């Protein structure tokens, strides 16, 4: 496989950007080697500058649920662009997308569009603190909620790959207001509430963890977190930046029957354009400026092209589309598990809907500690062999892979065939 142009571009990029990239996980630090520079994408495939063709399971880290360059999405975005790329004023497209969100998630009684998932989560935290008059928040070890200072405490994803439990530059006075507990461990969360309940403004969680690899909630865990929040007067914030409109038309909240006080969105809601949102209970959201005193603002919030992209993508995600995604994802997970068994490589294939992770472990992976115990060297060998055979997976053991409605049975078959060869390579690594 040719990589000469990617290598040359990476050399130039290292002179221009920290680590040669504009987001850490893209640098292949977790697996080694040279990141591929992508020139174009179509459907379920991406193509690099050297002409290599890959079945894409990164999908821009989740947003491309209908695949790349879907004609309906492209048409609606092009129509919006002809009208103007940004107004700094309200537009009808904001209402079209918001009404579609609330139709599918009626618990989102009011919402605010922002420009990223990080902006959504940090805004939700501010709103929770302002609404409750409390300062502390609780997050779960290994859950990643964006790059805001209050949430870079025991975060997963790229922070995990770098081996940093926290990021330098986060003041201790900020971090001390972020309490943590192990994911899937209700007794541990109860202890946190017993110790600090009167000062806790909110608990924020990924309902299905995606930034430690896919961690599946144990039965009763999510509802238990909700109930503890109710008992102690804290807000229950569900971070659906990754899961929203991906796991079902109602996201993870719809799938698991949750009713959050606040919910955050990103990724799918913008179909690949920069966008985020937070929303929830009417009485909570009515405290947000200009209706209330809790300040939040953004120059590009509600950008018309992002609104158009999200609206087009969500309209395409019918119940039939979700059924197709489930069938394809189940077939891929089963094929990967079988290929690993053939190679006698112990793995755990964790999956919820169209999110999955192959963990190189002989034990169940259900929290940050069990994820960190995985064999990242074997994952690195597996990743590079898959890349060589045309399957583009997330370049980290601690990330989720995604499928789209553009993926086909042939894509899955090609990927499983590549996995048979890749697991054989991984078996050679101790």
Swiss-Prot record:
Pathway noted in the entry: Porphyrin-containing compound metabolism; protoporphyrin-IX biosynthesis; 5-aminolevulinate from L-glutamyl-tRNA(Glu): step 2/2
Taxonomic superkingdom: Bacteria
One record GO biological process: protoporphyrinogen IX biosynthetic process
GO cellular component: a single term: cytoplasm
Keyword Coiled coil: no
Subcellular locations according to the entry: Cytoplasm
Annotated EC: 5.4.3.8
Cofactor: pyridoxal 5'-phosphate
Top enzyme category: isomerase
Reactions catalysed: (S)-4-amino-5-oxopentanoate = 5-aminolevulinate
Positions of post-translational N6-(pyridoxal phosphate)lysine modification: 267
InterPro entries named in the record: 4pyrrol_synth_GluAld_NH2Trfase (IPR004639), Aminotrans_3 (IPR005814), Aminotrans_3_PPA_site (IPR049704), PyrdxlP-dep_Trfase (IPR015424), PyrdxlP-dep_Trfase_major (IPR015421), PyrdxlP-dep_Trfase_small (IPR015422)
Alphabetical list of Pfam families matching this protein: Aminotran_3 (PF00202)
Main location: cytoplasm
Gene Ontology molecular function terms on file: glutamate-1-semialdehyde 2,1-aminomutase activity; pyridoxal phosphate binding; transaminase activity
Keywords: Cytoplasm, Isomerase, Porphyrin biosynthesis, Pyridoxal phosphate
Subunit structure: Homodimer.
Family as reported in the entry's similarity comment: Belongs to the class-III pyridoxal-phosphate-dependent aminotransferase family. HemL subfamily.
Protein name, as recorded: Glutamate-1-semialdehyde 2,1-aminomutase
Organism the protein comes from: Anaeromyxobacter sp. (strain K)
Primary gene name: hemL
